[in-house]
Design a protein with these regions (language model features):
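Conserved short beta-strand elements that form part of the metal-binding/catalytic scaffold
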Residues: 42-81, 125-131
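N-terminal beta-strand motif that seeds the catalytic metal site of vicinal oxygen chelate
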Residues: 1-34, 39, 45, 84-87
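Vicinal oxygen chelate
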Residues: 17-27, 57-61, 75-102, 114-121
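A generic structural signal for short, solvent-exposed coil/turn residues
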Residues: 12-14, 36, 50-51, 61-63, ...
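Short acidic/polar active-site loop segments enriched in Thr and Asp
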Residues: 18, 107, 124
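Short secondary-structure junctions
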Residues: 40-49, 103-111
């Protein structure tokens, strides 16, 4: 809530942006590029950024939004679902996207929220929600 002015309440509208930045270990680069490009149909491109040692991968999703992946040896890395922020993808057919992920060898994650969760290499979890 923003400061009040002249006795009236003033509110600031805040929204979550459509860009996400995560970290991964360098040995995951190829797996992650494959995961997004082949499995999810959202090719990743390498992008150089001043001050960052290795090129990042930037994924542009067809329905909007971007995911940038910065590579560092200090990134968390696990074969189990990471207990951190889980990211949401939206699709017309969440079940079909999950099936494609599973057929590509990605790991399904069970959670009572709904049935469409999977883990990418390194432990980051995504949920797939319907677009409507």
């Amino acid at each position: 809530m923003a400061p009040r002015s002249a006795g009236k309440a003033s509110y600031v509208v805040i929204a979550l942006g459509s860009n996400v930045h995560i970290f991964a270990r360098p040995h995951r680069r190829g797996e992650l590029a494959q995961c997004f490009g082949t499995v999810l149909g959202s090719p990743a491109r390498a992008v150089e950024f001043p001050g960052i040692d290795q090129p990042m991968l930037v994924v542009s999703f067809p329905g909007g939004g971007h995911l940038s992946i910065e590579f560092t040896d200090e990134a968390p890395d696990d074969e189990q679902p990471r207990l951190g922020a889980w990211l949401e993808l939206r699709a017309d057919d969440p079940a079909a996207v999950l099936q494609a992920a599973l057929e590509a060898g990605l790991t399904e994650v069970k959670h009572p929220g709904h049935p469409y969760y999977f883990m990418i290499p390194g432990g980051q979890v995504f949920t797939i929600a319907p677009t409507s």
